[in-house]
């Protein structure tokens, strides 16, 4: 039986991607196979990421793209700079909303607490950016955003990087208010003196 894994891939809004051989059109649920029988992250294969945040290194705006859970199979080759993987075969499984994307990014951090953080993750405190999300990790993390932004907040144990508590929620203007700092329990926390 062929080995299969799940990963993440971003596409243009029309489900196209630019490959070494040009633009490729995808459809959900269809298996695609690379002509080369050996995947090589530097020159061929279908490129995906194990950390959904790494997709934003290639498609910088979540609003101008689509992020999907994909199933990969066949020969695979891991990249050296982030969680990028090149696979011989790929199939689009599920499109992610922004909240699902951030939740899965938080799950990846929880599963790999000792890996270096993606540049979209901020230590201790984070403010939602142009991609409408913020992820903060630390012993006393906090985050804030505007209405519609998604916050992921992960508290580590004091003596190691393991995650002790985590939350992910949308600033909805009712339960969670805009421009208010929240902790990993989803509770309001005070701003730093210089922020008041």
Language model features: what each stretch is:
Residues 1-196:
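Short, glycine-biased loop/turn motifs at secondary-structure junctions and
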